[in-house]
Amino acid sequence: MFSPIVSSTLQATAIAAASNVIAQLLEQRSKQQVPTTISAADFLRFVIFTLLTAPPNYLWQHTLERVFPGRKPIDSTKTVLPRYEIREHDELLGEDVLQQEEEFGTKLDWKNTMIKWFVDCMTLGALLNTAAFLILMGIMKGRSPGEIGTALRTDTFPIIYASYKIWPSASIVNFALIPVEKRIVFLSAVGLVWGVFLSLTAAKQ
């Protein structure tokens, strides 16, 4: 069986591949291009980009959850330990934490949830992911350092602003309303839509 980080990376890559194919088909349809063809180069670039960025994003999400736990025990005398402290090399919110939640009962920690939302969706996470996207896509397309620098200056904030239409609200819904066992499905659906946008953006780089 794959480790959690490998499984998450493969899932993210599959979603990215699907979103890139959809984006290429939509772009060709808008240009009334017949017959439709899939650019293998664009497809492979997007797949490689996801393979490179999914593992650090996985670790980033775990770090956020460790520093700002999303749930707290209803009984303040109880402590729900992060799984990192229970089993060092295992996945976040695994069986041990879930068993503790069932035993003690937990509630959403709104303060920590909003901190994670702000750091990840609104500021640092959005900035780092967008910069990685522009830099890696530029390198894979053979752009010069000057051209990549120009893309960073001109495209970073427009992409971040576009992400504000999707990820902040999706993140709040995910943390506050979606059961733990269904969050991957929810985020995967949102990621598919966002992947289409990034694919269309990458095609213009």
Regions found by a protein language model. Give the residues of each.
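Short amphipathic alpha-helical coupling elements at transmembrane boundaries
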Residues: 150-154
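Alpha-helical transmembrane segments of eukaryotic organelle membrane transporters
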Residues: 2-29, 39-78, 82-83, 109-141, ...
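Membrane-interface helix termini and inter-helical loops of multi-pass transporters
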Residues: 31-34, 146-148
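Charge-biased low-complexity scaffold regions
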Residues: 95-106, 123, 132, 136-149
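Intrinsically disordered, low-complexity domain-flanking/linker segments in eukaryotic proteins
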Residues: 33-36, 72-107
